[in-house]
Amino acid sequence: MAKVLQENDKAKVCEVIKNSNLRGRGGAGFPTGKKWEAAMKQNTDQKYIICNADEGDPGAYMDRSILEGDPHSVLEGMAIAGFATGADSGFIYVRAEYPKAVATLITAIYQAKDNNLLGDNILGSGFNFNVELRLGAGAFVCGEGTALMESIEGKRGMPRNKEFRTTVKGLWGKPTVINNVETYANVAQIIEKGADWFKSIGTEKSSGTKVFALVGKINNPGLVEVPMGTKISDVVFDIGGGIPGGKKAKAVQTGGPSGGCIPTDLFDTGLDFESLKEIGSIMGSGGMVVMDEDDCMVDISRFFLEFSVDESCGKRSEEHTSELQSHQPIS
């Protein structure tokens, strides 16, 4: 943060983040630097920075771990985003079901203010940036950016029509940058070590590392941070220790309810945005659910369809009807 404020060059910060090829870790993989640059170019009286910590995919707890273990990396990333885009106000939207993360964030915000890293005139630079917490009530749909903004505004968490990008018209109709926890946690390291350092990790199009929550039928469940492009087989067998009881692996599910179940004959696929898309799955926020030979894929499909039906906002009747119809044949 000190380096950014000393150089006092918003465009340079956006350029460094663009050159690093940092992409959103919330699932979509949109280039972070392009998003910041778009918000920076908006000429308006107010802009906002939002951290999406509404982690809702079954089995995923990457954001919770970062918020509990290193909240200052997220706050610093948000403040740098605020400087780069011209925003002076930020919000962290976090699940109320994460009480330890909430308590840790509250403490971290006070610590940052006490050390002049948040608030007014940060480090004597004239830059002001404040962060507020907003607690989500557990609705999965609020993980969608515009639904999250509706919730912050005190409304029902319903996705908006995408007439404008949120960098043009977001929170309270003002330009807004929204990234997830892991994305912000990477920012300070990129500023400190440089774009080339970050690009040296991972693949050409998917730079850096990714945190995955390795859960399910696995000997060593837990959080795993690996370079983008690491093979699924390396994560499941080398890091995860394989399947309990010497049983055979059947599949790995990535991408949450909207993702896909990847069979063992595709375990040589790299964990990066492009490779997963090629085989019909997605990165998602980082949940990896391992299934063994005893798991029934019909039951797995039923579970995710039921989850999607239960958590649907119901805004588009044809969408909800389609989900229900998909669910009926396998009930």
What residues fall within each predicted segment?
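Gly-rich Lys/Arg/Thr-decorated short loops/hinges at beta-loop-alpha junctions or inter-strand turns
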Residues: 1, 51-63, 166-171, 213-219
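Flexible inter-domain linker/hinge segments
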Residues: 1-17, 179-194
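Ferredoxin-type iron-sulfur electron-transfer modules in oxidoreductases and energy-metabolism complexes
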Residues: 2-19, 45-47, 53, 62-67, ...
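Local cysteine-cluster metal-coordination motifs and their immediate loop/turn environment
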Residues: 22-31, 140-142, 250-258, 281, ...
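Histidine-anchored nucleotide/phosphate-binding helix
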Residues: 70-84
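Short amphipathic, charge-patterned alpha-helical segments
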Residues: 77-81, 228-245
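Hydrophobic alpha-helical positions that pack around
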Residues: 102-228, 240
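Single conserved hydrophobic/aromatic residue that forms the stacking wall/gate
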Residues: 320-331
